[in-house]
């Protein structure tokens, strides 16, 4: 009965607060794999105007949200939760997630999951000489049935599954430096009242982006790399555009991808999504994927409904 009363009080205060200000409420629950950069994400979110709390026990998330939103009137909140939270809290995340949505509204609550590829996590732990949280003590390692770093990483994936399945935003930091991470987060949360479509060109030879919602492979198209005069150019250069103009299949593929995205992105975004990442890949991420990503940005910005922002990023730009 007391819990229901608290929820009712929170909803009443929230309604009053929203009516008195035009600010949009945003509650981010930030979680993810150890070594993936959750603390960096929370620090950046703080720079972007969020009130950030790290390493919060999951069971205290509803209470923290109520105190910050209803008692203090804070509108942008990022609450960090990691594997150190009690196991019972993790298994109860469905109920916690539903409670937050019911209290503050579907669009106000977002789960952000930060991850990285296993080899990247291993390299980071080795470089910093830090111990994975599941291996802090030998006795704890035995208790968790993990005896080495790869086993701890694998075990953590299983334990965090209740949070991962609710993730609205997934960020893979494997190939991001701190500046790129800040730019990515700004795209996700820095534009109020807008939905962001992130177009990302990349090279398959450097690995596929695991945080993409859609991946299109354009390696079947003619490759300017084999033209010696174009090898040093990129898909943003006029001479590469002229090269592609001689191949109608390039325009056809660009049009087909645009048609697919125009048809399905609006429906995809109706599921309370604030961002969608569309990755376009070629071999090296320099010519074909860059060209198509740029042209898709122009086409989608003019054809998608109002309120959608389309950004274009080129993951391999530092390699050009």
Swiss-Prot record:
Keyword set, alphabetical order: ATP-binding, GTP-binding, Nucleotide-binding
Cross-referenced SUPFAM superfamilies: P-loop containing nucleoside triphosphate hydrolases
Any one GO molecular-function label of the UniProt entry: GTP binding
Record-linked InterPro entries: P-loop_NTPase, RapZ-like, RapZ-like_N, RapZ_C
Binding site for ATP: 32-39
Sequence positions that bind GTP: 82-85
Superkingdom of origin: Bacteria
Family recorded in the similarity comment: Belongs to the RapZ-like family.
NCBIfam families in the cross-refs: PRK05416.1
Function as written in the Swiss-Prot or TrEMBL entry: Displays ATPase and GTPase activities.
Name of the protein this chain belongs to: Nucleotide-binding protein Pcryo_0127
């Amino acid at each position: 009965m007391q819990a229901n009363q608290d929820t009712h009080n929170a909803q009443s205060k929230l309604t009053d607060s929203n009516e008195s200000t035009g600010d949009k409420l945003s509650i981010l629950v930030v979680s993810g794999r150890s070594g993936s950069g959750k603390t960096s994400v929370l620090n950046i979110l703080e720079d972007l105007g969020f009130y950030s709390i790290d390493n919060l026990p999951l069971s205290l998330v509803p209470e923290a949200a109520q105190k910050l939103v209803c008692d203090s009137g804070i509108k942008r909140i990022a609450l960090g939760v990691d594997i150190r939270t009690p196991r019972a809290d993790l298994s109860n995340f469905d109920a916690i997630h539903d409670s937050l949505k019911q209290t503050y509204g579907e669009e106000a609550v977002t789960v952000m999951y930060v991850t990285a590829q296993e080899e990247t996590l291993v390299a980071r732990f080795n470089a910093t000489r830090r111990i994975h949280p599941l291996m802090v003590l030998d006795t704890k390692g035995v208790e968790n049935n993990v005896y080495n770093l790869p086993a701890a990483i694998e075990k953590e994936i299983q334990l965090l599954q209740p949070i991962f399945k609710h993730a609205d935003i997934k960020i893979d930091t494997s190939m991001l430096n701190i500046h790129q991470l800040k730019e990515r987060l700004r795209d996700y949360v820095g534009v109020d009242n807008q939905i962001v479509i992130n177009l990302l060109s990349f090279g398959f030879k450097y690995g596929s982006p695991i945080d993409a919602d859609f991946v299109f492979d354009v390696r079947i198209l003619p490759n300017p790399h084999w033209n010696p005069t174009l090898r040093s150019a990129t898909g943003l250069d006029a001479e590469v555009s002229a090269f592609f103009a001689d191949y109608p299949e390039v325009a056809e593929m660009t049009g087909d991808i645009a048609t697919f995205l125009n048809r399905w992105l609006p429906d995809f975004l109706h599921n309370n999504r604030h961002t969608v990442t569309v990755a376009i890949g070629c071999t090296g991420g320099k010519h074909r994927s860059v060209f198509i990503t740029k042209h898709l940005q122009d086409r989608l910005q003019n054809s998608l409904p109002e309120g959608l922002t389309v950004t274009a990023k080129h993951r391999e730009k530092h390699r050009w």
